[in-house]
Amino acid sequence: MDGFANGTWSSPEDLCDDAEQKANLSALCSLLRNLSLEARPLLRQPRDLLVILLYGLVVLVSVFGNALVCHVVFYSRKMRTKTNVLIANLAVSDLLMTTLTIPLSASRFLLDNWPFGEALCYLAPFLQVTFVYVSTLSMAWIACDRYSVIVYPLRLRRLCPSHRAIACIWTLAGALSLPHAVFNRVVSLFTYRPLVRCQVQYPPPPAEFRKWLTLATFITQYVLPLTLTALMYSRVSYALWSRKALGATTREQQAWHTRSKRKSLKMLVLVVLCFAVCWLPLNVYHLVAHFRADDGPDRHNSSLFIFFHWLAMSSVCYNPFIYCWLNNKFRQGALACLTCLLHCTHRRRLHQSLMKPASLASRGQSAKRSSTLRSTSVGSTNKTTSV
């Protein structure tokens, strides 16, 4: 769930769009639109700068961190375990959301118009909701996989391979996200100047349809996957803290196996908790806004909505730090990648610095040759003239 899925546009114009469906207030709404558009360049300038700074920081950190996670997993064959491949799938989803939808979401807070065309008006909310579904479904699948490995280590594992699991996750996420793509429309608003907006137009009655779609998305995208994940991890925690490790012959081996699995479990649980905390305020905001009895204008507090939206989008940044903090192999792989990157950059700069004196020397020699040739030609010309 996010602003795309619900068509949230925190401005007086959108309040007017809701009001015009309920009462004949077109004159007042036209006045509100004109006043808001005239005052916006002055009133929103500090907020716009803050939006650009915060969302830009999210994009930079997420692109660097999630690309690093994908590199660590796919570069080393030892890191391509089933859990790590699903973690990389989660990183790919976060990376795609960062590059494809977060800039569009931020632009809706900054621009009066929708300059991206009708195709992106349909595609942007679909991709946004799909990527969130992929995140929650991936976390639930990882939890089920850990449950089958730790709670029943001697039982034949019946979960499908990682590539099939990823295909199932993306297919189910896309199917569940379809309702958020079919109702978007590019509409024209005529005030003192024409505007183009990407808005959601639900079938009648639109208010009721939006309520139940919001509730259904909240349950399938947030409540059910995270509840299943919590149940699986609670059972896994009980198993880890109450029995000895299988196959360990000494106390030191038992302690090492148990400590390793507990640390891995802490990492996965922290990833889920971080996601849940980041997305809970925005989901509650949508539910309260759509189910409140009094549908007044105070529910559209744009600054509050932007903060909740930014908090939800920032969830794409934290996982790489959690992996490097609680997983030694991830940390070693990330350090090796960064060391190689810095070393290659240093070698490139050193090569360029060594090439500069040589190029300057060659330029100096060519200049001397040209001046010598020029002086020789002048001397020969003077001799010819004197003769």
Model-derived features: where do they sit?
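First transmembrane helix
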Residues: R47-Y75
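Loop architecture of class A 7-transmembrane GPCRs
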Residues: L31-P41, F109, N113-P125, V129-T130, ...
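Extracellular TM2-ECL1-early TM3 structural module of rhodopsin-like
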Residues: R44-G56, K82-I142, S148-L159
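Cytoplasm-facing ends of alpha-helical transmembrane segments in multi-pass membrane proteins
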Residues: V63-F74, I102, T130-P153, A165-A167, ...
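Intracellular effector-coupling site of seven-transmembrane GPCRs
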Residues: C198-Q201, P205-P206, F218-Q221, Y238-C278, ...
